[in-house]
C-alpha cells in the first residue's frame, strides 16, 4: 500500500509541475487556448483525481 501511495504522490507532483509550466504557456500563445483547451481540462481533471486518490491512500496508510 505504501508503494501505491508513493507512486500516486509522485504522479501528483509531476502533474502539478507539468501544469505549472504548460498552462501559462497556453494562455500566452495567440491561439493556444482554443487549440489546447481539451489538454488543459484533461490535465486539470487528472490533477483533481490524483488529489482525491492521494487523500484516500493517505487515510488508509495512517
UniProtKB/Swiss-Prot annotation:
<keyword id="KW-0674">Reaction center</keyword>
<keyword id="KW-0793">Thylakoid</keyword>
<dbReference type="Pfam" id="PF01737">
    <property type="entry name" value="Ycf9"/>
</dbReference>
<keyword id="KW-0150">Chloroplast</keyword>
<keyword id="KW-0602">Photosynthesis</keyword>
<keyword id="KW-0472">Membrane</keyword>
<dbReference type="GO" id="GO:0009539">
    <property type="term" value="C:photosystem II reaction center"/>
</dbReference>
<dbReference type="InterPro" id="IPR036512">
    <property type="entry name" value="PSII_PsbZ_sf"/>
</dbReference>
<keyword id="KW-0812">Transmembrane</keyword>
<dbReference type="InterPro" id="IPR002644">
    <property type="entry name" value="PSII_PsbZ"/>
</dbReference>
<keyword id="KW-0604">Photosystem II</keyword>
<comment type="similarity">
    <text>Belongs to the PsbZ family.</text>
</comment>
<keyword id="KW-0934">Plastid</keyword>
<dbReference type="GO" id="GO:0009535">
    <property type="term" value="C:chloroplast thylakoid membrane"/>
</dbReference>
<comment type="subunit">
    <text>PSII is composed of 1 copy each of membrane proteins PsbA, PsbB, PsbC, PsbD, PsbE, PsbF, PsbH, PsbI, PsbJ, PsbK, PsbL, PsbM, PsbT, PsbY, PsbZ, Psb30/Ycf12, at least 3 peripheral proteins of the oxygen-evolving complex and a large number of cofactors. It forms dimeric complexes.</text>
</comment>
<dbReference type="GO" id="GO:0042549">
    <property type="term" value="P:photosystem II stabilization"/>
</dbReference>
<keyword id="KW-1133">Transmembrane helix</keyword>
<feature type="transmembrane region" description="Helical">
    <location>
        <begin position="8"/>
        <end position="28"/>
    </location>
</feature>
<protein>
    <recommendedName>
        <fullName>Photosystem II reaction center protein Z</fullName>
    </recommendedName>
</protein>
<comment type="function">
    <text>May control the interaction of photosystem II (PSII) cores with the light-harvesting antenna, regulates electron flow through the 2 photosystem reaction centers. PSII is a light-driven water plastoquinone oxidoreductase, using light energy to abstract electrons from H(2)O, generating a proton gradient subsequently used for ATP formation.</text>
</comment>
<dbReference type="GO" id="GO:0015979">
    <property type="term" value="P:photosynthesis"/>
</dbReference>
<feature type="transmembrane region" description="Helical">
    <location>
        <begin position="41"/>
        <end position="61"/>
    </location>
</feature>
Amino acid at each position: 500500500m505504501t508503494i501505491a501511495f508513493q507512486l500516486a504522490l509522485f504522479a501528483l507532483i509531476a502533474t502539478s509541475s507539468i501544469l505549472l509550466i504548460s498552462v501559462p504557456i497556453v494562455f500566452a500563445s495567440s491561439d493556444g487556448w482554443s487549440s489546447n483547451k481539451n489538454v488543459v481540462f484533461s490535465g486539470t481533471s487528472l490533477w483533481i483525481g490524483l488529489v482525491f486518490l492521494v487523500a484516500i491512500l493517505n487515510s488508509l496508510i495512517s
